[in-house]
């Protein structure tokens, strides 16, 4: 399923330097129907007729879609260079798999960019598909 086939909901929008930062939520089929979130920064010069490069910023351990957007200090340079930035959450949230939150460095918030191959993880833990295929398709 592509992003264009998904229902994106705008959670918030903020003007940042000469662009717009929008937080979206959507139901992700590759995460087993869980809600996923991402922040997208678009410089003001970007449009359908003026495409700009896109940087996908994959945050690390214990991060959400907000960490780099709030702390990365990237928007001034992205505005100047006319670069869009996508900040996806790098973990599925709400899978409620027994034991997934027993350790801070495994499970929710761990930020592994792989697809799980074993049950019960394989239904929801497909962050490679989300980060490298699902979001980049559009």
What kind of region is each of these model predictions?
Residues 1-7:
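Eukaryotic N-terminal low-complexity, Ser/Thr- and Lys/Arg-rich leader segments
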Residues 8-45:
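N-terminal cap/lid segment of alpha/beta-hydrolase-fold proteins
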Residues 25, 39-41, 56-57, 85-87:
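Short, conserved beta-strand segments within well-ordered enzyme catalytic domains
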Residues 47-48, 132:
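Secondary-structure boundary elements
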Residues 48, 52, 59-88, 93:
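Short substrate-entry loop that stabilizes the transition state in hydrolases
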Residues 87-129:
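Cap/lid segment of the alpha/beta-hydrolase catalytic domain
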Residues 133-138:
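Conserved small/polar residues in nucleotide/adenosyl-binding loops
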């Amino acid at each position: 399923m592509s992003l264009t086939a998904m229902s994106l909901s705008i959670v918030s929008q903020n003007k940042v330097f000469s662009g717009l930062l929008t937080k979206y939520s959507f139901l992700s089929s590759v995460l087993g129907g869980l809600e996923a979130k991402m922040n997208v920064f678009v410089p003001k010069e970007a449009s359908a007729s003026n495409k700009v490069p896109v940087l996908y910023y994959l945050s690390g351990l214990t991060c959400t879609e907000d960490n780099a957007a709030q702390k990365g200090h990237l928007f001034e340079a992205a505005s100047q260079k006319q670069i869009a930035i996508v900040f996806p959450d790098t973990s599925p949230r709400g899978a409620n798999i027994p034991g997934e939150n027993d350790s801070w460095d495994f499970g929710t918030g761990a930020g592994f960019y792989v697809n799980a191959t074993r049950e019960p993880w394989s239904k929801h833990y497909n962050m490679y598909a989300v980060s490298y295929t699902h979001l980049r398709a559009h």
